[in-house]
Amino acid sequence: FPQANFVTIDATEHDKKIAVILGLTHLINVVFANILAKDDKISLTEKMSGTTFKAQKIITESILTESPELIDTILSNPELRRYAEELWRDIGRILTATQEGKSEDVIEYIKSSKERISKNVDLEKSYKKLSTMINSIKT
């Protein structure tokens, strides 16, 4: 792995980081795959889709090439539960706010997330990378 980064951390910190790096991403994508698998008009969905959906679908499909046993091991990380519960709470919060017409709460949630993540990431650069990635693999 010539591009690999090696970091020395204790086992607890490792499990916490891997819960986000692999656990949360695998959990989200396995569930997304299950939803896509139930779409009886997937070709229409794909035809209507844009950059975000295409990128997510590729990631989801790629994860499904891994063995179910490996995915199960990744999802068995005990540290994942805390992040999954936070994800579930936030999904509920956002859906409730949208259904109750509380756009200001949703917008504030998005702005707050954007502000915090922007401290470490150039979001415009990330969007350009996404566009470049999708454009390079169009079939």
Region spans (language model):
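An accessory alpha-helical subdomain
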Residues: 8-138
